């Protein structure tokens, strides 16, 4: 990530702004953990212990990564947000419309159906009506000198 930031910063004109967003802490919780637990149970080879954005999901780690990429001064803000889940099926559609689809598409049809049923059951039984969708925003302005 620092190398990509370094290249973006290099390409930015003097006086320009670089704006980055990343998922904040607890992304898609409380349902995220259940999703990955069911993946581990049905396709352990696809289980990810850490999501890539977890490395930069708080202001301090995002600031450190940007500094590693050559950005010394930036403003970082956090927006706490909940993504509404109208029904268990809406949660499944959220998964299908997210980066998690890459994992789901690698499952066999029977495994995918078991993961789907486990997730729908959790959302239904736990009465989940929203998941966390917190975001961090970083804005850095390149000096004109």
Language-model region placement:
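Conserved Class I S-adenosyl-L-methionine
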Residues: 51-145
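Conserved catalytic/acceptor-binding region of the Class I
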Residues: 2-3, 9-86, 102
């Amino acid at each position: 990530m620092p190398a990509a930031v370094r290249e973006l910063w290099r390409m930015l004109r003097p006086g320009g702004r670089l704006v980055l967003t990343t998922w904040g802490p607890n992304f898609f919780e409380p349902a995220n953990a259940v999703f990955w637990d069911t993946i581990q149970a049905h396709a352990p080879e696809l289980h990810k212990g850490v999501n890539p954005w977890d490395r930069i999901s708080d202001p301090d780690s995002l600031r450190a990564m940007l500094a590693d990429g050559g950005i010394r001064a930036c403003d970082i803000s956090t927006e706490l947000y909940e993504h509404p889940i109208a029904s268990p099926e809406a949660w499944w559609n959220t998964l299908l419309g997210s980066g998690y689809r890459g994992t789901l598409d690698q499952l066999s049809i029977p495994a995918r159906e078991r993961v789907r049923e486990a997730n729908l059951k959790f959302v239904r039984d736990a009465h989940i009506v929203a998941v966390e969708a917190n975001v961090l925003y970083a804005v850095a302005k390149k000096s004109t000198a």
